[in-house]
């Protein structure tokens, strides 16, 4: 059973904002939206199901854009940077009106293929300016806009949560993907710096485990056990998100506490998360796509940053791990899985 307390992000406010004026799509014209996705390609049945559950597509529908009626959605998938680069090139060749992605790494791949087709990113986990993807937050200036999540205060908070629930916590593993493969070394370096500073402040010894491809997660967890790590801080990238169930299962098998960026890791069995509401970020991303389809230029649309973060907790997982959740911590949870 899932209970929710104040499960409304600040980003929801105004998400049904009125469309832009008379400019943009001509009456009767079909909008073409491209989605670049991480993972194996879906079947037609899976695509049909996703169309009824996708927060982005639901957001588009609420704004008047319905797939199969006045909008065509081109989907392309990949499971590695090389595959995604090929998928991005294919989307660009199809001359879609706007491209939509969930992360900075995917936006970067698309930007290498096109400097003209607008790109909307719904949850860029890092500084888009420092990564060279936009000129400034107030005026991106190029063909990328959307929402970004700065981790400066979030990584320390996640480590604090681990410390609050794991007795005598002193050794933590930091599981991350090699984002340099996505040509975003600045973001990787920033993550490492923030985690190292937070660990020192909390008197925690941090051990970094970097996965490069599918199949390396099991080896990483074996390394954590060898190091006698007591908890795992999990970085979220599209690749890690696709493999979230494997990560959750490995953590359960090795009986180790975990803290994630998003509640979508906690629902299948992860212990805790602290971060933004990803479905709401996707719905907010739809607002950007709508504005662009109606004539706005991406370079003129300011980058948004969420101010509301949610703490999700899986009590069932805590019980299996033999952890007692302090009542004060439980009261602060926005989402509790019992």
Residue ranges and their predicted role:
Residues 1-338:
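Short hydrophobic alpha-helices and adjacent helix-cap/hinge residues
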């Amino acid at each position: 059973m899932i209970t929710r307390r104040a499960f409304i992000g600040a980003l929801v406010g105004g998400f049904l904002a009125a469309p832009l004026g008379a400019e943009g799509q001509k009456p009767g014209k079909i909008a073409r939206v491209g989605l670049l996705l991480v993972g194996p390609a879906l079947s037609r049945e899976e695509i049909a199901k996703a169309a009824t559950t996708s927060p982005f597509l639901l957001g588009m529908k609420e704004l008047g854009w319905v797939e199969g009626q006045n909008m065509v959605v081109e989907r392309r998938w990949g499971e590695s940077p090389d595959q995604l680069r090929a998928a991005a090139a294919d989307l660009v060749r199809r001359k879609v009106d706007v491209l939509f992605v969930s992360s900075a790494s995917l936006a970067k791949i698309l930007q290498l293929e096109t400097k003209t087709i607008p790109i909307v990113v719904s949850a860029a986990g890092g500084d888009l300016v420092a990564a060279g993807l936009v000129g400034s937050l107030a005026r991106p200036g190029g063909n990328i806009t959307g929402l970004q999540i700065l981790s400066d205060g979030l990584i320390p908070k996640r480590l604090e949560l681990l410390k609050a629930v794991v007795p005598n916590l002193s050794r933590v593993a930091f599981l991350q993907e090699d984002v340099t493969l996505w040509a975003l070394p600045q973001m990787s370096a920033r993550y490492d710096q923030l985690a190292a500073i937070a660990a020192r402040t909390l008197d925690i010894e941090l051990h970094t485990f970097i996965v490069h491809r599918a199949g390396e997660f099991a080896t990483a967890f074996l390394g954590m056990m060898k190091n006698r790590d007591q908890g795992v801080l999990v970085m979220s990238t599209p690749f890690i998100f696709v493999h979230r169930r494997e990560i959750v299962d490995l953590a359960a098998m090795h009986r180790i506490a975990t803290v994630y960026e998003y509640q979508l890791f906690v629902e299948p069995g992860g212990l805790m998360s602290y971060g933004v509401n990803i479905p709401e970020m996707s719905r907010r991303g739809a607002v950007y796509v709508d504005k662009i389809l109606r004539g706005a230029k991406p370079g003129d649309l300011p980058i948004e940053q969420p101010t509301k973060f949610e703490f999700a907790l899986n009590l069932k997982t805590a019980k299996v791990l033999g952890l007692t959740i302090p009542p004060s911590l439980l009261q602060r949870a926005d989402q509790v899985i019992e």
